[in-house]
């Protein structure tokens, strides 16, 4: 996944973009066979909720049983890094340009929204997955579910 040259993003902004992307992406079952985002977002949310307590429990358990501190800390750090890996991946995905097959479908969905009377901001540059998430979220609110039949 390459990042477009005109949208430079630093390492820490990818986490923020990943969080925004996970909140924007519509969690619809009909999108799951085509896009991996549903699974990644679900697992990232799960990791954000459960990995910190698991890391603390693992650290305390290994120390209480007389284990060494090094492996205990390494295990806890690994558990804490899992949610960050998910957010980083989502941030990278949000700025990735759409492939040609999805790009055509993106413009079809935008056309259906405009035909329904929705005012959409013009697309600047090559659309990315964040633009797709915004468009899909709006389409699920405004259109009937038949717009997914072309997917």
From Swiss-Prot:
Keywords: Cell inner membrane, Cell membrane, Membrane, Transmembrane, Transmembrane helix. GO terms for cellular component: plasma membrane. Pfam families: DUF412. The chain crosses the membrane at residues 46-65, 69-91. It comes from the Bacteria. It is found in: Cell inner membrane. It is a multi-pass membrane protein. Belongs to the UPF0208 family. HAMAP family: UPF0208. This is UPF0208 membrane protein YfbV. The lineage of its organism: Bacteria, Pseudomonadati, Pseudomonadota, Gammaproteobacteria, Enterobacterales.
